[in-house]
Amino acid sequence: MQIELLKFQNDVKAKGLKVLILIEGRDAAGKGGAIKRLIEHLNPRGCRIVALEKPSDVEKTQWYFQCYIAHLPSAGEIVIFDRSWYNRAGVEPVMGFCTPQQHKDFFLREVPLFENMISNSDIIFFKFYFSVSKDEQKKCFEKRRSDPLKQYKLSSVDQKSQELWDKYTLAKYSMLLASNTPTCPWTIISSDDKKKARLNLLRFILSKVEYPKKTGDFSKIDVKLVCSGEEEIRKMEANLEKFDSKKADEKIKDLD
């Protein structure tokens, strides 16, 4: 599949196409490893990874999406966001880094409009959410704590992820409801098995694009590990219905 990805990149450059890939998910979902595998053999001159730091004091005064616009792909480019504007749909509201109004009244209302503008700008747009279970996340955190070479990956925010699991689940549900649209849909990839998740990512992308001398059938996606945003919403709602809506914040089930 790496050869096929390189063929696709060559076609992107030759035709002046623009490709944008968002990789989202909880902490320890395997986002970084998947991106590393995705770009492993791509030409770095035509491929960029965007992983922005927390906003500066100046950026905090700007339109929320402004800092991301400068990083969108130009003709011939593939751009991969390692987390994106969806920080405001997950970690920011859960950790109190933004107000409820900034989250619900602005972001969740505006993000479909913003992404429609991206889609209407002839950008090939993918949105992936890597879904890790609570138990697997806990195991990953324990490995990071015990491995000096991985301890840098464990932040104070990460360490609260288990405690705030249910709130992150509700935030994910709100995000999918607001931003899973026909023009910019989500694809959910189960990532407890990191190797399979990476392979499914590559396979899914290749199944959705065409380029000269394409070889191989990539249409057989593992439906046990990959689903649409719409399917994920249905799964989450089936679990949510088991709980009194007034107590959902406290008693929601492990939905990932």
Where are these regions (language model features)?
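Glycine-rich phosphate-binding loop of ATP-dependent small-molecule kinases
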Residues: 1-256
